Amino acid sequence: MSKIIIRGARILGGEPGDVLIDGETIAEVGTGLDADGATVIEAEGQILLPGLVDLHTHLREPGREDSETVLTGTKAAAVGGFTAVHAMANTFPVADTAGVVEQVWRLGKESGYCDVQPVGAVTVGLEGRKLAELGAMHDSAAGVKVFSDDGKCVDDAVIMRRALEYVKAFDGVVAQHAQEPRLTEGAQMNEGIVSAELGLGGWPAVAEESIIARDVLLAAHVGSRVHICHLSTAGSVEIVRWAKSKGWNVTAEVTPHHLLLTDELVRTYNPVYKVNPPLRTEADVLALREALADGTIDCVATDHAPHPHEDKDCEWAAAAMGMVGLETALSVVQQTMVDTGLIDWAGVADRMSFRPAAIGRLDGHGRPVSAGEPANLTLVDPAYRGAVDPAGFASRSRNTPYEGRELPGRVTHTFLRGRATVVDGKLA
């Protein structure tokens, strides 16, 4: 088995140290480490993190391989420092049966760039009327633990209650896309001053907040776990904070783009900024950052949503919603959270590895950088500065809102169970 020494890295941003990888496992952590025949990576000034975990990725396969495949999506994940991603269920066919989630799981095994944990649909066909085969998906080879109709809201309170009751039996979690559909009909962007000035249909904050309020109450009533996808408003933060103060089993995520971008960008009418939930106000952005820093929001999730060029190269109203995010997520978090002093690199490890792995009950990921642990690791150069060039993306799609924007930090190496998937910033 191969041996690798990562020398002089700041482990979780702390003091410099060495890590010896032997095969698939971290063999030793210390200083001045040596091993016969080991490959040495000089990592002075770099940050060593546990491999990143994404709770919210759209890999599009099966059905929309024109925008992404499991192979290209996991390549993008590795470049971004991720060693595990959760693949959302809004594929064609929908991942609402054991057969489809096992197909996605096997494609992930074959890709080899990161682990793929399928997310099962809550309802048949994402139609919100009948529970999908939750138990069968959990008992399948894919071992599904997270269920979501993401892209659509489980807006029927009875269906949501039944889903929460069902997954409680095996410690699963329902991840809710909080969007009251009757309040967002025809909506094109955040409802506010900018939407009024542009004459675009507004997407009110209460459409998100009302569903979150309902669902934290349902979760408390049932005694089950609920996870809120892509929190985007200050009001949503307050509801989650209140629910947590009650001791209820509620977790939440925020996307990198909601930590940085605002609805002012919609003035450009560039569809690259069209996303669900929409970009909100500066006040919302600041509230989300504070909530991620204080733990009200548990983790960062990319909501990586690739689209082919033609789905974005059109007028705003006709454009698809979504942004790619796997390859830029860590840089955006560094800019908005680390460089601003809101969290340190240990906080990044917590919000982008430990907590998402714990929420997804994902074995082997989100583990300490310690002897005996799986060698799922990410090495980051925080001093790097560079403009985002989507032409160099590993993802099949290019719909990034950051094209040409200078972002800090770069993943130099990613290790999946001791095997380098990224070396010097490039796929191995």
Locations of regions flagged by a protein language model:
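C-terminal cap of metal-dependent C-N hydrolases
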Residues: 315-318, 371-426
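Metal-associated gating/positioning segment near the N- to mid-region
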Residues: 46-111
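Histidine-rich, glycine-flanked metal-binding segment
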Residues: 1-51
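Active-site mouth loops of central-metabolism enzymes
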Residues: 55-68, 89-91, 117-130, 151, ...
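Histidine/acidic residue-rich metal-binding segments in metalloenzymes
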Residues: 131-300
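Divalent metal-coordination and catalytic microenvironments
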Residues: 9, 24, 45, 56, ...
